[in-house]
Amino acid sequence: LVHGKPMWDTLHVDLPLLPDGDMRHRTVVNKRFGKPSVTDFRLIGSCGGYSWIEAKPKTGRTHQIRVHLAENGFSIVCDPLYSGNQKPLRLSELKRNWHGDEDSEKPLLSRLALHAYKISFTHPKTGECLTLCAPYPKDMEATRKQLAKIFKVDPIEDETE
C-alpha cells in the first residue's frame, strides 16, 4: 500500500542499489557502484489517496521494493526509512465526517504496509513449481476493508481469491 495514485498501470524499474553504510541501514541508488536491481510493478487499484501495488523483484537487494517505489515518487505507507510520512494510518484521516476521540483512536496500520502475499519458485530437487500464499495480516486486512468501504471500491478483492 503506497501513498498516491500512479499514472501508470505497469512500471519497470532498473536502478542499481548500494547499501548506504549509515546507521539507519538504508539502501540508495548508486549508478556507479550499485549492484543491478530490477523490479516490475503493477497497479492493482487506488482508493482515495492510496494505491495497492504488486511488486515483482527480479533481483534480491536489501530494501529493493521500498527504494524503487520511493525513487518513483510512491512511498510505502508507514515506511520509517524511505517516506517523509511514517505516521500511523488512522481512520480519522480517511473518513471526512469522522466523529471520534482522536486521543484514544487506535491506528488502522502502524507498521510498514508491505506484505509478501505470494511467492513462486522451482523446487531444487523435483523441479516442480511451488507457489506459497500468505493471507494479509489482520491490520492490513482491516485497512483494506476500511478503504473499500469508504471509497466504495475494493481493488484487491479479486486478487486475494
Regions found by a protein language model. Give the residues of each.
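RNA pseudouridine synthases
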Residues: 1-161
